[in-house]
Design a protein with these regions (language model features):
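Local cysteine-cluster metal-coordination motifs and their immediate loop/turn environment
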Residues: 93-107, 112-123
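Rieske [2Fe-2S] iron-sulfur-binding subdomain
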Residues: 1-91, 111, 125-207
Length: 207
């Protein structure tokens, strides 16, 4: 908001949406309306401009030591996802809901390879391909395996953090290994600091 000159009686005239308002004491009503949101840079869900930009890079999504034997539901760039480590210690990051009956894979079972749904037991590899479809007629299983996929994203572990790439697979960049992250005699210790706000507000606060 653009401030004009100070007025008497402890008031302030402020231009808001091309309308002058006079703020004095008890101005809760005048101030309750938040500033318009710049959708172009604040919205980061699938299909948004900022979201598509962010999806061309690797992002830290979880601390490795905090991922146990059970799948974990997380939300990254506006997407509901499930992160897990199978019994062969492979990482998987997949869409939250099974493509069969939309059951949450947060309650899935980590297998030797991949994860299986707790509802009907459909079994998926870490890349989203189907390994088993129990309960389906034998003559339909090959067709289902060819035509149905669970959405999945590449992951990478580095310095105690799990990173993910959520963009088009053909545009996936190499994972960046910066010299500044590898000092002799120093150990990186990952940590997290949750902020209940938009990413842009965090950036404004630290720049």
């Amino acid at each position: 908001m653009k401030s004009d000159k100070l007025l008497g009686n402890r008031g302030l005239s402020i231009k808001k949406n091309s309308t002058d308002i006079n703020l004095k004491g008890f101005s809760g009503y005048e101030l309750k309306h938040s500033k318009e949101i710049d959708d172009e840079i604040t919205r980061i869900g699938p299909g948004t401009k900022a979201g598509e930009y962010f999806r061309r890079y690797w992002h830290p999504i979880f601390i490795s030591s905090e991922l146990g034997d059970l799948p974990v539901a997380i939300k990254i760039l506006g997407e509901e996802l499930v992160l897990f480590r199978d019994q062969s210690l492979q990482l998987g990051l997949v869409h939250k809901h099974c493509p069969h009956r939309q059951a949450s894979l947060e309650f899935g079972i980590c297998q030797k390879t991949g994860i299986s749904c707790c509802y009907h037991g459909w079994h998926f590899d870490v890349d989203g391909s189907i390994l088993e479809v129990p309960g389906q007629p034998e003559h339909t299983q090959d067709f289902i395996k060819q035509k149905v996929r669970l959405g999945a994203y590449p992951t990478h572990e580095f310095k105690g953090l799990i990173f993910a790439y959520l963009g088009p697979i053909e545009k996936k960049p190499e994972f960046p290994n910066y010299d500044s992250l590898d000092f002799d005699g120093m150990e990186m210790v990952p940590y997290k600091a949750p902020f209940d706000c938009n990413w842009l507000q965090v950036l404004d606060a630290i720049v």
